[in-house]
């Protein structure tokens, strides 16, 4: 007898499992199940046919893949979570009895969760871990600003603070920072680590405001923080070893003072948090710079292909960016946020200091005459030095994004700042702000000038050889032209003699043949005719594009039509948003022009009065 196939025993109905069934199978509570899924990187799935996956149920339920749940059954953490549940019950029992000794024993023997094997499992290679650093560093920088709470303890916040400071020191030592941006959310930083771009956000330092549980669940965030702290420890250790730096970070110069002798660990941690001192290396520092110089020399030898030329230009701009603030000394006023600016300036080779009474780690005072720039964020200053420029903090960010030192006249104290443009815009963006378009045009003009300057230098070096080659080519061309002309004249004379003999034989030819010959001779002669501009009809062009799009849509396969429609909808949405931005910009410009005209009229009235 043939075996009967029961409903939902195969196919999509057997592939998925509800969250309740998964918790029953793993014998875990809701909190432990969530924590286990976060640590293992398992998320709910969306089936193609939800009713079949839910075995006929029309309610929307959270579904997991059955293979993921069976994968969790072999996880050692499941046993630790079950042991924790038993320990929690015993601790509550001892607390209810008032037996503090037994409770302390239970707390001391409380089972700990080890995540080392999960890190190795989720990130088989070091590059895989670097690709996940975006979320890791963003969350750790957020946790480093939290105060001590019931769920987020002081240990977690201090550990997050230490790991983020270590990561920032690596970026400073490797000069890996590429882009910076300030927004309402915080400070955006992008670094290039092992060829991968890592972008993270550092929040603004505002007082902490407690949030409701419906909006923010700190227990779930704590599970992510536990995983990311272990991951960041592994990554920092590998990164420090890759550039031959001692881990955990230590100073290259021993600091002997009364404060350091009394509490050495606290003093060293404060100095490291200052981000203003070089850390200890296991070998000399000039190895990376020498390697970069060798790479640039290799690229200089071969500039024939366009790809190599682009790589050479990018390498040159990158080498200039790494030493953008080299030789400059900055002083930060007390109203300016210290940490992000110190981090940026140190990444690009600058020296920075601040008021020594404000925070530990300052290297020079405000009265130092060698200071080149002072960063101020107030409308006026009582005392100013002639030997330095007083700029607002935006000058630092814009200079880094433009990869050059911008003029400081637009960033003086009290000046209306230019718009702070985002460096994370894509090349295929539909809407480009006019300021950014002007800056791009200026960069292209500078590149052309640089290319012309390079060509002039090459002409100076190899000018004699190229001139000789050009003279030889010109002489060969002139010689060939003269030979061709002589051959043409000889052939023309022979043709004329033959034609005269034919005319003598046939004297009675009509005059029409002569006119035809004259016309043919005129046609054979070269003539330059002025061209006419062809005007395209925009309506016809639009109609043609629509017809082409319709034909293109017909050629799409039936299984890809949904994807094609989604792409078209996305493109339409992007164009609509770009048009809205253009309209808003036009309104703003119109309002500004109106205000300027009103100011001029008011000034004229005052002058006339």
From Swiss-Prot:
<dbReference type="GO" id="GO:0043021">
    <property type="term" value="F:ribonucleoprotein complex binding"/>
</dbReference>
<feature type="compositionally biased region" description="Basic and acidic residues">
    <location>
        <begin position="488"/>
        <end position="498"/>
    </location>
</feature>
<dbReference type="Pfam" id="PF16589">
    <property type="entry name" value="BRCT_2"/>
</dbReference>
<dbReference type="GO" id="GO:0000466">
    <property type="term" value="P:maturation of 5.8S rRNA from tricistronic rRNA transcript (SSU-rRNA, 5.8S rRNA, LSU-rRNA)"/>
</dbReference>
<dbReference type="GO" id="GO:0005654">
    <property type="term" value="C:nucleoplasm"/>
</dbReference>
<keyword id="KW-0539">Nucleus</keyword>
<comment type="function">
    <text>Required for maturation of ribosomal RNAs and formation of the large ribosomal subunit.</text>
</comment>
<dbReference type="Pfam" id="PF06732">
    <property type="entry name" value="Pescadillo_N"/>
</dbReference>
<dbReference type="InterPro" id="IPR036420">
    <property type="entry name" value="BRCT_dom_sf"/>
</dbReference>
<feature type="compositionally biased region" description="Basic residues">
    <location>
        <begin position="554"/>
        <end position="564"/>
    </location>
</feature>
<dbReference type="InterPro" id="IPR010613">
    <property type="entry name" value="PES"/>
</dbReference>
<keyword id="KW-0690">Ribosome biogenesis</keyword>
<protein>
    <recommendedName>
        <fullName>Pescadillo homolog</fullName>
    </recommendedName>
</protein>
<keyword id="KW-0175">Coiled coil</keyword>
<dbReference type="GO" id="GO:0070545">
    <property type="term" value="C:PeBoW complex"/>
</dbReference>
<keyword id="KW-0698">rRNA processing</keyword>
<feature type="compositionally biased region" description="Basic and acidic residues">
    <location>
        <begin position="444"/>
        <end position="453"/>
    </location>
</feature>
<dbReference type="InterPro" id="IPR001357">
    <property type="entry name" value="BRCT_dom"/>
</dbReference>
<feature type="domain" description="BRCT">
    <location>
        <begin position="320"/>
        <end position="413"/>
    </location>
</feature>
<feature type="coiled-coil region">
    <location>
        <begin position="539"/>
        <end position="607"/>
    </location>
</feature>
<feature type="region of interest" description="Disordered">
    <location>
        <begin position="488"/>
        <end position="609"/>
    </location>
</feature>
<feature type="compositionally biased region" description="Basic and acidic residues">
    <location>
        <begin position="567"/>
        <end position="609"/>
    </location>
</feature>
<feature type="region of interest" description="Disordered">
    <location>
        <begin position="443"/>
        <end position="462"/>
    </location>
</feature>
<feature type="coiled-coil region">
    <location>
        <begin position="481"/>
        <end position="509"/>
    </location>
</feature>
<comment type="similarity">
    <text>Belongs to the pescadillo family.</text>
</comment>
<dbReference type="GO" id="GO:0030687">
    <property type="term" value="C:preribosome, large subunit precursor"/>
</dbReference>
<dbReference type="GO" id="GO:0003723">
    <property type="term" value="F:RNA binding"/>
</dbReference>
<feature type="compositionally biased region" description="Acidic residues">
    <location>
        <begin position="499"/>
        <end position="512"/>
    </location>
</feature>
<feature type="compositionally biased region" description="Basic and acidic residues">
    <location>
        <begin position="513"/>
        <end position="524"/>
    </location>
</feature>
<feature type="compositionally biased region" description="Basic and acidic residues">
    <location>
        <begin position="533"/>
        <end position="552"/>
    </location>
</feature>
<dbReference type="GO" id="GO:0000463">
    <property type="term" value="P:maturation of LSU-rRNA from tricistronic rRNA transcript (SSU-rRNA, 5.8S rRNA, LSU-rRNA)"/>
</dbReference>
């Amino acid at each position: 007898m043939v075996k009967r196939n029961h409903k939902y025993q195969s196919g999509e109905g057997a592939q998925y499992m509800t969250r309740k069934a998964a918790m029953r199978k793993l014998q875990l509570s809701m909190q432990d199940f969530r924590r286990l899924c976060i640590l293992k990187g398992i998320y709910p799935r969306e089936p193609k046919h939800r009713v079949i996956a839910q075995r006929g149920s029309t309610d929307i339920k959270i579904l997991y893949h059955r293979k993921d749940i069976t994968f969790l059954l072999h996880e050692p953490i499941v046993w630790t979570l079950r042991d924790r549940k038993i320990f929690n019950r015993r601790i509550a029992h001892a607390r209810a009895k008032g037996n503090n000794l037994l409770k302390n024993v239970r707390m001391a023997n409380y089972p700990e969760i080890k995540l080392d094997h999960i890190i190795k499992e989720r990130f088989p290679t070091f590059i895989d871990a670097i690709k996940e650093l975006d979320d890791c560093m963003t969350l750790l920088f957020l946790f480093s600003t939290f105060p001590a709470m019931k769920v987020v303890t002081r240990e977690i916040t201090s550990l997050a603070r230490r790991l983020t400071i270590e990561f920032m020191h690596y970026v400073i030592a490797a000069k890996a920072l590429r882009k910076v941006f300030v927004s309402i959310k915080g400070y955006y930083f992008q670094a290039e680590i092992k060829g991968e771009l890592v972008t993270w956000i550092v929040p603004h330092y505002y007082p902490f405001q407690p949030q409701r549980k419906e909006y923010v669940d700190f227990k779930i965030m704590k599970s992510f923080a536990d995983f990311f702290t272990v991951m960041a420890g592994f990554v920092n250790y590998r990164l420090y070893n890759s550039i031959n730096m001692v881990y955990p970070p230590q100073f290259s110069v021993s600091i002997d003072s009364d404060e350091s002798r009394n509490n050495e660990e606290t003093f060293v941690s404060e100095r490291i948090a200052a981000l203003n001192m070089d850390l200890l290396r296991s070998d000399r520092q000039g190895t990376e710079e020498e390697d970069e110089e060798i790479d640039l020399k290799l690229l200089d030898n071969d500039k024939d292909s366009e790809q190599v030329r682009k790589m050479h230009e990018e390498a040159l701009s990158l080498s200039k960016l790494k030493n953008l603030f080299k030789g400059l000394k900055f002083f930060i006023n007390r109203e300016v946020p210290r940490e992000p600016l110190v981090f940026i300036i140190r990444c690009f080779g600058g020296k920075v200091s601040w008021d020594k009474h404000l925070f530990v780690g300052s290297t020079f005072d405000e009265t130092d005459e060698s200071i080149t720039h002072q960063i101020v964020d107030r409308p006026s200053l009582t005392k100013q030095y002639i030997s330095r420029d007083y700029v607002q903090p935006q000058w630092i960010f814009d200079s880094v994004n433009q990869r050059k030192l911008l003029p400081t006249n637009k960033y003086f104290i009290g000046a209306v700042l230019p718009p702070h443009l985002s460096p994370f815009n894509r090349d295929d963006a539909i809407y480009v702000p006019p300021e950014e378009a002007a800056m791009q045009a200026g960069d292209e003009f500078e590149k052309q000038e640089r290319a012309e300057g390079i060509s002039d230098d090459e002409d100076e070096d190899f000018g004699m050889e190229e001139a000789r080659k050009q003279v030889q080519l010109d002489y060969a061309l002139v010689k060939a032209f003269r030979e061709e002309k002589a051959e043409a004249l000889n052939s023309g004379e022979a043709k004329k003699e033959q034609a005269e003999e034919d005319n003598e034989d046939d004297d009675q030819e009509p005059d029409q043949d002569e006119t035809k010959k004259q016309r043919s001779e005129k046609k054979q002669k070269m003539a330059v005719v002025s061209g006419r501009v062809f005007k395209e009809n925009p309506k016809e062009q639009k109609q043609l594009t629509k017809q082409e799009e319709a034909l293109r849509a017909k050629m799409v396969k039936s299984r890809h039509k949904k994807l094609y429609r989604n792409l078209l909808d996305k493109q339409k949405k992007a164009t609509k948003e770009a048009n809205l931005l253009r309209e808003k910009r036009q309104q703003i410009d119109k309002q500004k022009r109106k205000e300027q005209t009103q100011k001029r009229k008011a000034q004229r009235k005052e002058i006339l009065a």
